[in-house]
Amino acid sequence: MEDRTRTYLKGRFGDYYARARMDTPPAANRREWGHIPWSAGSTTMVRHQSLLELGTLDDFLHRTAPKHVYFSAARFNDPGATTMDQKDWQSADLIFDLDADHLPGVNPDTTSYADMLTACKTELQTLLEFIDDDFNFDETQVVFSGGRGYHVHVRDEQVRSLDSAARREIVDYIRAIDLNIETLIETQSNHGTTQRILKHRGGWGQRIHKRLVELIETLQASDDTEALERLQSFEGIGTGRAETILGQIQNNPEAIHAGNLEAGGAGIRILADALAQTAFEAETAPIDEPVTTDTNRLIRLPGSLHGGSGLLVTPLDREEIPSFHPLEHAIADRFRGRDIQIRITDSGVTTFDGETFDITEGNKTVEECLGIFLMARGRAEKVTE
């Protein structure tokens, strides 16, 4: 990035912060604050600052116009101290991070930025199902990171005291790491006999049970030949076992709906095992483990600008998420309504503000919000007006 471009972006970020009013997180004065300046080649964070040392946050942001702004998930007794021991850790929000670069099926070299963001929002919906249905967290905040993904802040009191190991268990559960169907089965006594029942009132057991019931309903709607062929497509199920399973489905489907994995012999258990592996692969949320397990993590400030895109770090109400499109709705109004001149250095197809177009190298006059986006992403430089 050329000096002229860097100076321009810092100036315009400062103009944005001159009018913006930031909402601070709970217990803001007990959190560590950090920022990355617009210095040439700088990726080093200035940290170990308390809100008291910064002064008024809005004034600090206007004066320094940082490239990136962060605050700690943790709450400390002395957040401005230079060592973690001196800070005296008290608690920390539980943070989930989804980054498009880490999503299955996304290649940062070939997948467009717009497509990465779309894929990431799909994964966000999956993550929120875990947060709401499996963990029943109440105090949550969803934030578009301004870059390639989303953050979810969980501030329920019972999670703030969790150490890194406990947070890793949450990550492992969501990502189905080392998850075994045996942990989802309980033994029940029924008229003197024992039955192995799939727990299906929530969590992973419910996900597997749903797939099992859907398969059973598909087999019920098929003729016998099709149903037997479908059953034999599962490893470990031959002709005889397929016939036994189909007979159970036709004569006693209620037992399977109740989660009885011993109905009809070992066949239903084999089906459940196979469907569990499918669920573990398809229904996880690819959260970034180091972010969640780090109890001292610094995370982006909602309402601030992301120096790598010029987009807003945007807090979202749940009802806003389905219709939220970052490349339209995370554009700062401050950068709309005027044109600037830039020099395109990296040509190619670009999606921005509801339009997709092919930009070519050379000097261009564009709306400022697009110009800032391209410059921040390293695809353009500022030229003299």
From Swiss-Prot:
Query: Which molecular function GO terms apply here?
Result: DNA-directed RNA polymerase activity; metal ion binding
Keyword match Amino-acid biosynthesis: no
Q: Could you mention a single GO BP entry for this protein?
A: DNA replication, synthesis of primer
Keyword Transit peptide listed: no
Task: Tell me the keywords, alphabetical order.
Answer: DNA replication, DNA-directed RNA polymerase, Magnesium, Manganese, Metal-binding, Nucleotidyltransferase, Primosome, Transcription, Transferase
| Disulfide bonds, paired cysteine numbers | none
Of which family is this protein a member?
Belongs to the eukaryotic-type primase small subunit family.
Describe its function.
Catalytic subunit of DNA primase, an RNA polymerase that catalyzes the synthesis of short RNA molecules used as primers for DNA polymerase during DNA replication. The small subunit contains the primase catalytic core and has DNA synthesis activity on its own. Binding to the large subunit stabilizes and modulates the activity, increasing the rate of DNA synthesis while decreasing the length of the DNA fragments, and conferring RNA synthesis capability. The DNA polymerase activity may enable DNA primase to also catalyze primer extension after primer synthesis. May also play a role in DNA repair.
**Protein name, entry field:** DNA primase small subunit PriS
Q: Which organism is it from?
A: Haloquadratum walsbyi (strain DSM 16790 / HBSQ001)
What's the source species' lineage?
Archaea, Methanobacteriati, Methanobacteriota, Stenosarchaea group, Halobacteria
Gene symbol here is priS
